[in-house]
Amino acid sequence: HSQGSFTSDYSKYLDSKQAKDFVIWLMNT
């Protein structure tokens, strides 16, 4: 099940990256 846990970790990473990019975008506008 390592593939499944990797996928969920990766999606969590993408979510946090998107959230960070969103905060930066908010601060820049």
Swiss-Prot record:
InterPro entries: Glucagon (IPR015550), Glucagon_GIP_secretin_VIP (IPR000532). Gene3D superfamilies: 6.10.250.590. SMART domains: GLUCA. It is found in: Secreted. One of its GO terms (molecular function) is hormone activity. PROSITE patterns: GLUCAGON. One of its GO terms (cellular component) is extracellular space. Induction: Produced in the A cells of the islets of Langerhans in response to a drop in blood sugar concentration. Keywords: Hormone, Secreted. One of its GO terms (biological process) is protein kinase A signaling. Signal peptide: none annotated. Belongs to the glucagon family. Glucagon plays a key role in glucose metabolism and homeostasis. Regulates blood glucose by increasing gluconeogenesis and decreasing glycolysis. This is Glucagon. The gene is gcg.
